[in-house]
Amino acid sequence: RDVLRHHDGTIVMAQDITDRKRAEEQIATYVKQLEGSMRGTLQAVSNMVEMRDPYTAGHERRVGLIASAIAKEMGWDEPRCENLELMGLVHDIGKIAVPSEILTKPTRLSKVEMELMKGHAQAGYDILKDVPFPAPVAEIIRQHHERMDGSGYPQGLMGDQILPEARILAVADVLESMSSHRPYRPAVGMEAALAEVENNKGRLYDAEVVNAAVKLITERGYVLPS
């Protein structure tokens, strides 16, 4: 019923339309509250991970921001970019399962220790797989160390088997990691980080993602968040 004829002949909007609009407004408010709650929860989880790994404090937040900026440069819509930023906040959640002495070791990891560290991608999936996110967050987290030629981990996926969000997180992760201090080495700088992704464009890293990242930083003057 779209309209209601009043007894005096005046056409007025039907009550059901008013009710529908009110319901839509209430739903929109609820969705915003839910999004805020989810962001707060993911931030808390990210903080918990970084408490165990102080050398990468802020790493997840920065990766999320970089990934979102790259996605925006690629033409992704705002909601999808925001979701990717949130995924960045928890992309290393699986490090909870890695012994702290490995996370903070001041020298390079042994082969055995490296295998334990690599387990964080699968552990992240296992932690998040039953959470009803509106996107395949757990799968994206599991794939953020996969590489286009199949040389990544944990599944050895290649090409289109890797979800677009994971491809962007992979590049954002490399750019942030190489530009930041680590227990076993000083920061190598943005120039070296860009060289890494450009030299391996199409082999390890998605070419479209690399092109967008390079343009964002070298042409648009994007500065990595501190």
Task: Please name every model-derived segment.
Residues 1-4, 160:
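Output-coupling edge of small sensory domains
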Residues 5, 24-25, 56, 171:
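General helical structural elements
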Residues 6-16:
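PAS-family sensory domains
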Residues 9, 20-23, 194, 218:
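A broad, low-amplitude sensor of folded, mature protein cores
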Residues 15-29:
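PAS-associated C-terminal cap
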Residues 30-32, 39-226:
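Metal-dependent catalytic cores of enzymes that make or break cyclic nucleotides
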